[in-house]
């Protein structure tokens, strides 16, 4: 069995070496009209350079409300200068400041010619047409030089960037109204098992609805890809083979169920019959040990366990970085963060455990008298094993218990994996 970190690294390396991602995705770009529909750009991966069309700021820009002047004019506290005009955002003072003069200036306004500093209004008093300065002025205060943020032609957003509101604001600022973004990869989802029925069907006494298909489609969408949800496949070789072949028309194929070692677990053998290379089929985690990663007909294929909590965990660990690469994005490291345990943990060693949990921000159990109310505290939830999706829904994260430290005490720090889209 592979440690989950090694399995995740193998997925990333395989996608990079065999599919040439993320760079190869820039060639299949789509164009988004930003003024028409900025929502369409959120979460997309940029497939071009976005460069500054001029210097930013394009002028020396005040960062405070106050008065602009020559600093030499206020060498001593108590100096009075004649107020000769105003500079505000969008309207510059038209003249040049001379010695003994000052100009009222507002935040975001151009620094007048001749001025080399701005004094905040809190340090002044107005006396008719004069302004009294309570402190001596210093050169270069409270303004930003033209071009300090970006020079004309400088790349301000590189390709491969995931677009959020700040990136879209930068694109708008530099006049990039149309953005090239990578095509969203299509992810085929096939749930397997004779026990599955459609969501709108009434299950028989020993049947269940196909919740895995829905949860996987939601996870695929949260990563920024396009889910293609197929009908479930029965545990029958010919039907499963046909479902896999149809799924290989997408950019990535996800199968859930049928990956263990039972009589009706047919996924791995069917993939081999189709010429697939199995890169791993067992990972040292619980839940999620019987996870398959394969390469078939030039496409990545994942066989995830059928138990729904296993499916959720293994998707985040292994499938999410593959989709990010196919989107043209270098996957981020697994977003673990530390939290203090609300209670002891006693698990078996030999593999890593991902336990449904909830993190809150409160006084830590080891220091409730003095701890600030910002300490993340995590507690696991009662659950009935990897089929208990209700436990995951009641939580907002998974607690990682590493194989090297299966026994943990209350108050110790442990790693938490946030549930995507919730925490």
Role assignments for model-derived ranges:
Residues 39, 44, 52, 62-65, ...:
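Short, basic and Ser/Thr-rich N-terminal targeting/leader segments
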Residues 1-78, 163:
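Intrinsically disordered, low-complexity, positively charged segments
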Residues 1-5, 177-304, 308-314, 365:
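Helix-rich terminal scaffold detector
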Residues 8, 12, 65, 121-122, ...:
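Predominant activation on well-ordered alpha-helical scaffold segments within soluble catalytic domains
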Residues 2-8, 22-34, 38-39, 48, ...:
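Flexible glycine/proline-rich
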Residues 2-5, 50, 65-234, 382-383, ...:
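Short, glycine/charged-enriched hinge/interface segments at domain edges or termini
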Residues 112, 165, 261-263, 310, ...:
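Short glycine-rich, flexible loops that bind phosphorylated cofactors or substrates
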């Amino acid at each position: 069995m592979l440690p989950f970190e090694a399995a995740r690294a193998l997925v990333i390396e395989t996608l990079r070496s065999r599919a040439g991602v993320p760079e190869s995705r820039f060639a299949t770009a789509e164009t988004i009209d930003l003024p028409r529909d900025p929502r369409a750009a959120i979460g997309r991966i940029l497939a071009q350079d976005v460069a500054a069309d001029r210097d930013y700021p394009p002028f020396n820009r005040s960062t405070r409300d106050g008065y602009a002047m020559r600093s030499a004019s206020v060498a001593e506290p108590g100096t009075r200068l004649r107020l000769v005009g105003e500079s505000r955002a969008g309207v510059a003072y038209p003249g040049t400041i001379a010695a003994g003069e000052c100009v009222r200036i507002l935040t975001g306004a151009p620094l007048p010619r001749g001025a080399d500093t701005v004094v905040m209004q809190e340090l002044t008093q107005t006396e008719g047409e004069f302004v009294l300065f309570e402190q001596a002025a210093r050169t270069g205060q409270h303004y930003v030089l033209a071009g300090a943020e970006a020079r004309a032609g400088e790349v301000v957003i590189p390709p491969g960037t995931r677009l959020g509101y700040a990136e879209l604001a930068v694109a708008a600022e530099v006049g990039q109204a149309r953005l090239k973004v990578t095509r969203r990869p299509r992810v085929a989802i096939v749930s397997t098992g004779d026990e599955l029925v459609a969501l709108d069907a009434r299950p028989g006494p020993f049947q269940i609805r196909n919740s895995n298909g829905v949860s996987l489609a939601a996870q695929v969408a949260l990563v920024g890809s396009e889910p293609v949800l197929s009908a479930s496949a029965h545990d029958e070789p010919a039907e499963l083979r046909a479902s896999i072949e149809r799924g290989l028309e997408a950019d990535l194929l996800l199968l859930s169920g049928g990956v263990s070692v039972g009589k009706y677990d047919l996924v791995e053998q069917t993939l081999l019959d189709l010429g697939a290379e199995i890169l791993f089929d067992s990972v040292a985690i619980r839940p999620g040990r019987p996870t398959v990663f394969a390469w078939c007909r030039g496409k990545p294929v994942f066989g995830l366990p059928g138990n729904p909590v296993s499916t959720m965990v293994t998707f985040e660990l292994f499938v999410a970085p593959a989709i990010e690469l196919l989107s043209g994005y270098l996957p981020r490291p697994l977003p673990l963060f530390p939290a203090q345990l609300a209670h002891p943990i006693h698990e078996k060693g030999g593999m890593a455990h991902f336990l449904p949990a909830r993190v809150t921000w409160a006084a830590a159990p080891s220091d409730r008298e003095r701890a600030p109310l910002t300490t993340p505290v995590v507690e696991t939830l009662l659950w009935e094993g990897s089929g208990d999706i209700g436990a995951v829904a009641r939580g907002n994260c998974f607690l990682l218990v590493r194989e090297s430290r299966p026994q943990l005490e209350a108050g110790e720090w442990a790693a938490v994996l946030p549930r995507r889209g919730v925490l």
